[in-house]
């Protein structure tokens, strides 16, 4: 065994062994417990960052631990390879997105392998390859024929200069990020998934996921947004609007109906269009609303603006005439594109009414009283007893809901209704680097799905986009085709699919990645699915995880899988954060400096109190800890860390520095500490092995000192097993290993029995570290005399007998204050313990002259003598 710990050589040798032995290739083994461990696959951006390293290390530790429990473990990896960054990089570097993507995959795959991940690389999937997306297209055609996918007009951000559609995040202050042109809202035909058909099931089956964080389930419940409310119709007539009809609104607060003082409609509402005829000012305002962002989050925070129309509607219960306003805070796609405004009890309506001097009428008695002041209070939105509401006065929310519904039904002007916030999922993207939508537009037959024998519709890979719309729409060689139904000239769809589609089913493809007769081999899929443990960032709590759940149900309904949910357990790992440093630039911005280029000064409590740039020695500002990012220049390159310290050190630091679901603060000194610890383990093992391996430990003849050492070993195994197996608390499991190391380093090695005990301790340390630091554990296991590989070794088991103490030390208190200790046989009776405590020399001094009133014995811990 080499005297020095040389991670580079040790890690290369271990990885070579795993590759040659195909150690992580798995096949279905009926009868053997399976465990499917999956970390969210990466976008091939070019280089791994520390967030990736943390994510994949957590997954790898879990996978290796489960293998040590004797399970058949699947841990695959792939690439979420379509998307906008590839198009942007292609334009910047004048290179085809395909070339850029495949080169990045090659580099990042090498990086992942250097971490020593226990991945079955034979199952690798790449979503931009036709052998992957052909099955996505196949499913699309099936769902289109069933009506689960449909086509309708949708509103998008249109850049008139670049002649292209922009994502919400590409619109900055109302202008295109590249062209700077003012963005317009446009209606274009798009394809949609009817995810709303599954809204109830997506909501209810969250209750079947006890292994998911409550926070994530709450976020999904809120996103689906099921609410029971009332559909209310406000009539209008010839005199008010020019024709008869009703304006439909949906409200979750029908109890406040008697407080409605105006109604507001979205800019796209038919009444807005009608009101704008002959009213240029209103038309200009409607156009302004239409040019704003289509993102709901932006609309929630933007300034509330509106314009009155000359139109009036009738209150359905009082007959009072209410003015119709066009308002930018009303969403056409929620409810019915119109709201009844109750300024006294809704904050948005309150703001709007105050801005435009509209009446405010309180109709609910809240904790703030019966009146509404000039400043909004949260209490105004509370449920309470109705006031100023005629025959409904005195009713609470539930009573008012029922009574007002009955009144509306009598007039045929309303009824209760369940509404969802969730909208159907629009998947059309006017981009090049995505999965082509397999539809042919025929002038005679309409929209025709591409027949299965003509799939995949292959994306040409030798294209360099120029940013001016989708190149596919300018490529007759791509879009010119014949109709599969009637044989006449037709045009292929040039939109591509939202890249969330690829990541919504990849977990199922891993079960049979080379299967060429369908999207999945149902037998293999049902063998492995659902995923036992899924690991990824909380930022995917809503969209990706909701779409993946939806797709799993679609696959179930196609007969491809039998389970209802894709992921049994979900672990959302925390961010990796690091210190930031900057100087204010001459233009008022900030120049950020990488922590590696900064020299820091700390106080006695290790808090950073000063920082200077190494190159010029001048001070820099301390920006505090933030998520590692390019924009703040506070990232640490994983490759440089692996080269300097080895993958095991990086893995150990990542697992020790913080519980996996909490933020992890990067610390160079923490990495140094992890490296020092592994060197200590190596040194102890090397010194032990160099003297020759000992014989078998004879547990029956251990002396008391040896029993203490063995107890420490097995206490650590017991605690680490609970920490890793039940709670994923890898940091506390590592702390247990460190405690054992402290004991083993001080343990005597004079006799054969001492050395046999050290052997047991080192084997336990190696096995407990094996999932976390697999390379050094691979080498140590062999050096400790084992013919098999540590990856095939079992997780250490606890010898409960080793934990039994022959003697125990009890604390003795007098009136709650520590006054002595007594050592007793573990099996001593209460009477014997009490007698020993009373007879303790030091205790006698404190009870001399006092009357003992009571003696409290807490078995195994303490004795408290109460005396006065």
From Swiss-Prot:
Chain positions recorded as ATP binding sites: 630
Keyword vocabulary terms for this entry: Aminoacyl-tRNA synthetase, ATP-binding, Cytoplasm, Ligase, Nucleotide-binding, Protein biosynthesis
Molecular function in Gene Ontology: aminoacyl-tRNA deacylase activity; ATP binding; leucine-tRNA ligase activity
Pfam families from the UniProt entry: Anticodon_1, tRNA-synt_1, tRNA-synt_1_2, tRNA-synt_1g
Catalysed reactions listed for this entry: tRNA(Leu) + L-leucine + ATP = L-leucyl-tRNA(Leu) + AMP + diphosphate
Segments carrying motif 'KMSKS' region: 627-631
Catalytic class of the enzyme: ligase
Keyword Aminoacyl-tRNA synthetase: yes
A Gene Ontology cellular-component term: cytosol
Enzyme Commission number: 6.1.1.4
InterPro entries: aa-tRNA-synth_I_CS, aa-tRNA-synth_Ia, Leu-tRNA-ligase, Leu_tRNA-synth_edit, M/V/L/I-tRNA-synth_anticd-bd, Methionyl/Leucyl_tRNA_Synth, Rossmann-like_a/b/a_fold, tRNAsynth_Ia_anticodon-bd
PANTHER family: LEUCINE--TRNA LIGASE, MITOCHONDRIAL, LEUCYL-TRNA SYNTHETASE
Protein family according to the UniProt entry: Belongs to the class-I aminoacyl-tRNA synthetase family.
Identification of the protein by name: Leucine--tRNA ligase
Biological source species: Pseudomonas putida (strain GB-1)
Gene: leuS
């Amino acid at each position: 065994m080499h005297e020095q710990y040389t991670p580079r050589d040790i890690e290369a040798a271990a990885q070579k062994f795993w590759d040659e032995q195909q150690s992580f290739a798995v096949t279905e083994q009926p009868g053997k417990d399976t465990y499917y461990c999956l970390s969210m696959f990466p976008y091939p951006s070019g280089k791994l960052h520390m967030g990736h390293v943390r994510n994949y290390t957590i997954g790898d530790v879990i996978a290796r631990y489960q293998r040590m429990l004797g399970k058949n473990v699947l841990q695959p990896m792939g690439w979420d390879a379509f998307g906008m960054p590839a198009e942007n990089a292609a334009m910047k570097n004048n290179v085809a997105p395909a070339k850029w993507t495949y080169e990045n995959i090659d580099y990042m795959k090498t990086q992942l392998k250097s971490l020593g991940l226990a991945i079955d690389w034979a199952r690798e999937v790449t979503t931009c390859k036709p052998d992957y997306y052909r099955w996505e297209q196949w499913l699309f055609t099936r769902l289109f024929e069933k009506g689960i996918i449909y086509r309708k007009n949708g509103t998008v951000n249109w850049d008139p200069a670049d002649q292209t559609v922009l994502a919400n995040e590409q619109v900055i202050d109302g202008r295109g990020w590249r062209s700077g042109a003012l963005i317009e809202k446009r209606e274009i035909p798009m394809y949609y998934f009817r995810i709303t058909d599954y809204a109830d099931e997506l909501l209810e089956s969250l209750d079947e996921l006890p292994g998911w964080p409550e926070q994530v389930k709450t976020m999904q419940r809120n996103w689906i947004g099921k609410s029971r409310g009332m559909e209310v119709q406000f009539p209008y007539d010839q005199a008010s609007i020019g024709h008869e009809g009703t304006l439909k609104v949906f409200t979750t607060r029908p109890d406040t109906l008697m407080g409605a003082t105006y109604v507001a409609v979205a800019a796209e509402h038919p009444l807005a269009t009608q009101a704008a005829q002959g009213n240029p000012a209103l038309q200009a305002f409607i156009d302004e609303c239409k040019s704003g962002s289509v993102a709901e989050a932006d609309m929630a925070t933007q300034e509330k603006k509106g314009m009155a129309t000359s139109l009036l509607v009738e209150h359905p219960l009082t007959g009072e005439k209410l003015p119709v306003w066009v308002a930018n805070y009303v969403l056409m796609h929620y409810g019915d594109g119109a709201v009844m405004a109750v300024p006294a009890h809704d904050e948005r309506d309150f703001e709007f009414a105050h801005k435009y001097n509209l009446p405010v009428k309180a109709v609910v008695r809240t904790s703030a009283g019966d009146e509404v002041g000039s400043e909004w209070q949260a209490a105004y939105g509370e449920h309470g007893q109705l006031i100023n509401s005629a025959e409904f006065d005195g009713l609470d929310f539930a009573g008012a809901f029922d009574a007002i519904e009955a009144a509306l039904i009598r007039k045929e002007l309303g009824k209760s209704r369940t509404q969802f916030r969730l909208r159907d999922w629009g998947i059309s993207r006017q981009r090049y680097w995505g999965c082509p939508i397999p539809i042919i537009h025929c002038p005679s037959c309409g929209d025709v799905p591409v027949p299965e024998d003509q799939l995949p519709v292959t994306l040409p890979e030798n294209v360099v986009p120029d940013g001016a719309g989708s190149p596919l729409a300018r490529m007759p060689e791509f879009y010119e085709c014949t109709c599969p139904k009637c044989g006449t000239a037709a045009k292929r769809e040039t939109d591509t699919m939202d890249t969330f589609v690829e990541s919504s089913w990849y977990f199922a493809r891993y079960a049979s990645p080379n299967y060429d007769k369908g999207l999945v081999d149902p037998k293999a899929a049902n063998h492995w699915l659902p995923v036992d443990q899924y690991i990824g960032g909380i930022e995917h709590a809503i969209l990706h995880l909701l779409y993946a759940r939806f797709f799993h149900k679609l696959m179930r309904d196609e007969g491809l899988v039998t389970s209802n949910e894709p992921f049994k357990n979900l672990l959302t790992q925390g961010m990796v954060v690091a210190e930031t440093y900057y100087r204010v630039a001459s233009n008022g911005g900030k120049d950020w400096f990488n922590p590696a280029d900064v020299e820091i000064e700390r106080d006695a409590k290790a808090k950073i109190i000063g920082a200077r740039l190494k190159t010029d020695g001048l001070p820099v500002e301390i920006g505090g800890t933030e998520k590692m990012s390019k924009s703040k220049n506070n990232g640490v390159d994983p490759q440089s860390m692996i080269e300097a310290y080895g993958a095991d050190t990086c893995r150990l630091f990542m697992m020790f520095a913080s519980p996996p679901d909490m933020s992890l603060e990067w610390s160079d000194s923490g990495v140094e500490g992890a490296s020092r610890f592994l060197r200590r383990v190596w040194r102890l093992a090397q010194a032990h092995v160099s003297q020759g391996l000992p014989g078998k430990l004879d547990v029956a003849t251990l002396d008391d000192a040896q029993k203490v050492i063995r107890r420490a070993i097995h206490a650590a195994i017991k605690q680490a097993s609970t920490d890793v197996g039940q709670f994923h608390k890898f940091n506390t499991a590592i702390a247990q290993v460190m405690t054992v190391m402290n004991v083993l380093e001080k343990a005597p090695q004079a006799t054969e029995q001492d050395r046999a005990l050290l052997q047991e301790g080192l084997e336990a340390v190696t096995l407990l570290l094996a999932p976390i630091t697999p390379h050094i554990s691979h080498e140590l296991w062999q050096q400790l005399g084992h013919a098999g590989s540590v990856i095939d070794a079992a997780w250490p088991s606890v010898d409960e007998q080793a934990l039994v103490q022959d003697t125990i030390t009890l604390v003795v208190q007098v009136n709650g204050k520590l006054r002595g200790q007594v050592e007793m046989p573990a099996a001593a009776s209460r009477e014997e313990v009490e007698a020993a405590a009373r007879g303790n020399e030091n205790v006698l001094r404190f009870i001399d002259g006092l009357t003992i009133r009571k003696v409290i014995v807490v078995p195994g811990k303490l004795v408290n003598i109460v005396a006065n």
